[in-house]
């Protein structure tokens, strides 16, 4: 099991849909979140992409020297990047970071954003382009280890004599992650990528997605790993966790929710449509309305695009829900929580000890020994909890 955190390059706050409690997205703050994830033992971080975010490659590059073991899941965007340039970017990042790059292939589903970026393809054509893009990208990087070039002539993309002189650390290339809920997305995942990511839907729906992608991959003689993207609200008790969930959306007003949902409805994204269906437009916002499956809460999706659900509960409950998804075949969990700095620590402290995963050293390379904590009465080290 791998557990990732999230770098909030699109903003961070204590409350959704308001400027109250908001934080400046400064490099110092993003670095704090990355260092927290690194020192607490997270395997990696997802860095989001889109016009609402700081550029993921610039941000990720700036965080290499601030971290030691943390991997970076960074987006490539067919239509915005050329595959040969994206291959060079990936190889250089992987070399400079010592093999800590992971690739997030993002086709995109916001038509207004895509057109603003110069991408005018329809849904089916975007997936065709993405398939050609990642095929070229993979071949260029894989052949860099033996000094070979690559030719390709496709419907949307072509290269002749494409070659990468400086190969990445990872062989044959950094692992490729990809998410999408349409049949075209599942076909692409089955044929081309290493790990399929889904947003947090109820377990029964996630199981259907996994089964479909597995069946499609089998036709190509391939196996695919699976991951899930979720928010998390964990506290020492269930009641505290649900109060925190209610607090997160306590500053929302109807107008903000209506405008957000109207914007999401215009997107050409099956995944976004499925997220919106979970809360029925957000007209009612009680726990009964938003708890769509045990401890799975759709409140985040009232105003946030993309991943819109959170696991809510005490540590044992959240860990049990994680294991429920793991039993379906999920082996990578990408979490986030508001605010991201505090919640990175809270989740690691409360939930990590309960997960069936081998934790890497929390303070890599320091050689420090415990127990840790403030000395009691100037004389005594705090006892380690036996719970």
Curated annotation (Swiss-Prot):
GO biological process: alkanesulfonate catabolic process
Pfam families the record matches: Bac_luciferase
Documented EC number(s): 1.14.14.5
GO molecular function: alkanesulfonate monooxygenase activity
Record field: catalytic activity: an alkanesulfonate + FMNH2 + O2 = an aldehyde + FMN + sulfite + H2O + 2 H(+)
Keyword Ion transport: no
CDD domains: Alkanesulfonate_monoxygenase (cd01094)
Group of enzyme by EC: oxidoreductase
InterPro entries named among the record's database cross-references: Alkanesulphonate_mOase_FMN-dep, Luciferase-like_dom, Luciferase-like_sf, SsuD_RutA_monooxygenase
Keywords carried by this UniProt record: Flavoprotein, FMN, Monooxygenase, Oxidoreductase
UniProt record similarity statement: Belongs to the SsuD family.
Free-text function comment from the UniProt entry: Catalyzes the desulfonation of aliphatic sulfonates.
Protein name: Alkanesulfonate monooxygenase
